[in-house]
Amino acid sequence: MAEAAGVPAESLAGCRARAARTVLDQVVLPGEELLLPDQEDGDGPGGAGERPLRLNAAARSRGRVVCGPGLRRCGDRLLVTKCGRLRHKEPGSGSGGGVYWVDSQQKRYVPVKGDHVIGIVTAKSGDIFKVDVGGSEPASLSYLAFEGATKRNRPNVQVGDLIYGQFVVANKDMEPEMVCIDSCGRANGMGVIGQDGLLFKVTLGLIRKLLAPDCEILQEVGKLYPLEIVFGMNGRIWVKAKTIQQTLILANILEACEHMTADQRKQIFSRLAES
Amino acid sequence: MAAERKTKLSKNLLRMKFMQRGLDSETKKQLEEEEKKIISEEHWYLDLPELKEKESFIIEEQSFLLCEDLLYGRMSFRGFNPEVEKLMLQMNTKNKAEEVEEQTVELDVSDEEMARRYETLVGTIGKKFAKKRDRAIYEEDENGDIKPVKAKKMFLKPQD
C-alpha cells in the first residue's frame, strides 16, 4: 500500500504544469499549476520548464483573466489552493479573458466583500451592533446602515435578531463590516428578518447549488405550499411556512437534498404532495 | 560711512515679495529656478535602476458573485410574502438586464430642435431681465439673431 501511494505522489511532483483548458470540470488538487490558454504555444513533448512571456499581439488581446476562489496567481500561471473541480466561464461582454475557479465544498465561511449573509446580533455597543456571521470574528454593523435610519431615528434591532446584510469590508487584516443598505441607500430586502421561522446551517456548496439560476429543487419546493426562504452565503438558511410542521419538513428537505439523487428527490416530493 | 559699506541683506530677505518687485523679470526667473533646484535636490529619491512594471493579466478575486450568476437570496413562493415576491422579480431581472444591451430611449423632441429652441430662448428671456442700459446689447442682427453680449467694463486692479 505504501508503495502504491508513493508512486502517484512522485509522478505528481514531477509532472509539468497542465493547460487549464484540458482540465476543465475535472478534479484538481492543491499545488497544481495551470497554464492559461495562450501560454501553450511552445508546449510540446520536448518543451522546457521555463517559458518566457511573449508580449506579442496574441498575449495582449487576451485581456484580463480573473482567478476566482480556490486559485491564486503564481507568476503567469494559476496555482490551485483548494481541491475540487475546475470551472470556467467565458466572458460575456467581451472584456477580459473569462473567469476560472475551483468548485469546492466546505462548511466554514470566510467573509468576502459583497456577499449577502444572514447574521445573528450578539451585542449592542454604542453605535454598532456585533453580528455573528460564522466567520472568525463577529462583524460590525453600524446603526446608521439601515434604510431611513438617522441619529434620532434608530432602527429597532435587539440582541438575538436575524439580519440579512452584505459585507462592505472583508479581508484578512480587518474586522468585517456589514451594512443593510446598498450603494444608493435603499434596503433591497436587507435588514431585520421577521418573526418566527427556523434558521439552520448547511454547507456552502449547497447554497450555491440552490441559488443557481436553473435549480430544480427550488422550483419543486415552491409548488408544495406557501413559504418564504432566505439564503445566506455563509451557509445559513432561514425558512418560514404557515405551520411549524411545514417549516420542519422544508428544513429537512433542504438539508437532505444535498446527498440525494434526482430520482430520490422526486420520490420524496411526490409522497409529500399526496399527503 | 554708511555709503561705503553696503548693508548685506540675507538671502531670505531678498526672497521676500516686497524685495522682488523692483527686480526685472529675468532675475526673477533665475531666482525661481534656483529655488526649484534647491527644493528638488533636497527631495530624497531611490537610486535604483528603473523597474519596469510587470503588467499582470491575472486578477485575483475571492468572491463567487463573479463566477456564477446566483439568484437573489430572499425568496417567497405562492404569495407568502408579497413584498419579497416583488423584490425577487426586481432583482432577478436587474441581473438579466445588465447582460442585455441598453436600448436607446426614444425622444419626443430631437436634440437639434432642442438646441435651436434654446438658442433663441436665452436671448428673449435675457432681454426681459436686462436693465435699460443693457438692453442696447441685445441688438438684433439682420437675420434676427441676437448678437453676443459684449464684455462689461469692470474695475481693473492696478498692477504693481
UniProtKB/Swiss-Prot annotation, chain A:
Disulfide links within the chain: none
Keywords attached to this entry: Acetylation, Cytoplasm, Exosome, Isopeptide bond, Nucleus, RNA-binding, rRNA processing, Ubl conjugation
Any GO MF annotation of the entry: RNA binding
A Pfam family recorded for this sequence: KH_6
Domain of life: Eukaryota
List of residues that carry N-acetylalanine: 2
InterPro entries (UniProt xref): Exosome_RNA_bind1/RRP40/RRP4, KH_dom_type_1, KH_dom_type_1_sf, NA-bd_OB-fold, RRP40_KH-I, RRP40_N, Rrp40_S1
Subcellular locations according to the entry: Cytoplasm; Nucleus, Nucleolus; Nucleus
Cross-link Glycyl lysine isopeptide (Lys-Gly) (interchain with G-Cter in SUMO2) mapped to chain: 151
One of the protein's GO biological processes: DNA deamination
Cellular component terms (Gene Ontology): cytoplasmic exosome (RNase complex); cytosol; euchromatin; exosome (RNase complex); nuclear exosome (RNase complex); nucleolus; nucleoplasm
Main location: cytoplasm
Quaternary structure note: Component of the RNA exosome core complex (Exo-9), composed of EXOSC1, EXOSC2, EXOSC3, EXOSC4, EXOSC5, EXOSC6, EXOSC7, EXOSC8 and EXOSC9; within the complex interacts with EXOSC5 and EXOSC9. The catalytically inactive RNA exosome core complex (Exo-9) associates with the catalytic subunit EXOSC10/RRP6. Exo-9 may associate with DIS3 to form the nucleolar exosome complex, or DIS3L to form the cytoplasmic exosome complex. Exo-9 is formed by a hexameric base ring consisting of the heterodimers EXOSC4-EXOSC9, EXOSC5-EXOSC8 and EXOSC6-EXOSC7, and a cap ring consisting of EXOSC1, EXOSC2 and EXOSC3.
Biological function: Non-catalytic component of the RNA exosome complex which has 3'->5' exoribonuclease activity and participates in a multitude of cellular RNA processing and degradation events. In the nucleus, the RNA exosome complex is involved in proper maturation of stable RNA species such as rRNA, snRNA and snoRNA, in the elimination of RNA processing by-products and non-coding 'pervasive' transcripts, such as antisense RNA species and promoter-upstream transcripts (PROMPTs), and of mRNAs with processing defects, thereby limiting or excluding their export to the cytoplasm.
Family indicated by similarity: Belongs to the RRP40 family.
Descriptive protein name: Exosome complex component RRP40
Species lineage: Eukaryota, Metazoa, Chordata, Craniata, Vertebrata
Gene field: EXOSC3
